[in-house]
Amino acid sequence: MSAIEVTGLEREFPGGIRAVDGVDLEVAEGEIYAFLGPNGAGKTTTVRMLTTLLRPTGGSARVAGHDVVSEAGQVRRAIGVALQEAALDPLMTGRELIELQATLHGIPRAEAGRRGEALLDRVGLSEAAGRRVGGYSGGMRRRLDLASALVHEPRVLFLDEPTTGLDPVSRKGIWEEVSALNREGTTVFLTTQYLEEADQLANRVGIIARGGIVAEGTPASLKAEIGNPHLEIGLVDGSPETAAQVCRAFGRPLPERDGKVLLELEGGAGDVAQVVRALDEAGILVESLELVEPTLDDVFVAKTGEHIEEEASG
């Protein structure tokens, strides 16, 4: 069964600017789906439509079985949303904020308190629950926002760049929590600028560029589309041109980089030993070898023509 079904989704802004142009995608229940795209590609606009914050100008979308236009209320009750720039009242304590969110979802006061305490404990904020949010670090605020999005036990969770700007330890903590939620059955729709995050967490990845989906699949299948692994060979001595000629029997030589011979291996990693043997027989001494597998960054560049912009952690 599908948690999210999108067909021909469009959004045109005044002046004829079409930010989203015929997006089709489907997310199965229980999946983690990573949605990637360059700045201005239509990623945020798509998410805003799926979460009922923006009305489509064409096409259709159903989330948790409900139409995002005609059944927007049902959609909102079925989803949790944690935005990159969460509007958390700095004067409220973490506990007060969680309980307020629960009340807004119609949860009785006693149950709101119970759920709030359980969620604060889950995201590691029990000790800080009585402190004002204005004194929280970036990582703590992100965890509080995640807890707020979970207070009504949503079927589908939308996470908008949940770890942007966080230090590696905080980022890993969010990853672990998202994975745990998914194991419990929550469908996760994740936008991220960290390709490693998509590779680690997602069952499937969709890449949007120029308003439309340009690639979709598992991280492994998308990387396999780009090509075979390549071998970076550093030489003690000998001509790189001669080495490339010897290597031609095992794959396609690529342009030299930093004085190293690059070879796309047609037979995969199993050919490495044969390449070394052939170079040795030709009297070419090898100083270093590195087998480099295709990455999601390679996929992103191939499909969009751009590198994704990653912010430094802080």
Question: Residue spans of the language-model regions?
Answer:
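A short, flexible loop at the N-terminus of ABC-type nucleotide-binding domains that lies
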Residues: 1-6, 10-22, 29, 72
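Conserved ABC transporter NBD signature motif
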Residues: 59-70, 75
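Conserved ABC ATPase "signature" region
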Residues: 99, 103, 110-128
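Conserved catalytic motifs of ABC-family nucleotide-binding domains
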Residues: 153
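Catalytic Walker B motif of ABC-type/P-loop ATPase nucleotide-binding domains
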Residues: 157-160
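ABC transporter nucleotide-binding domain
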Residues: 176-266
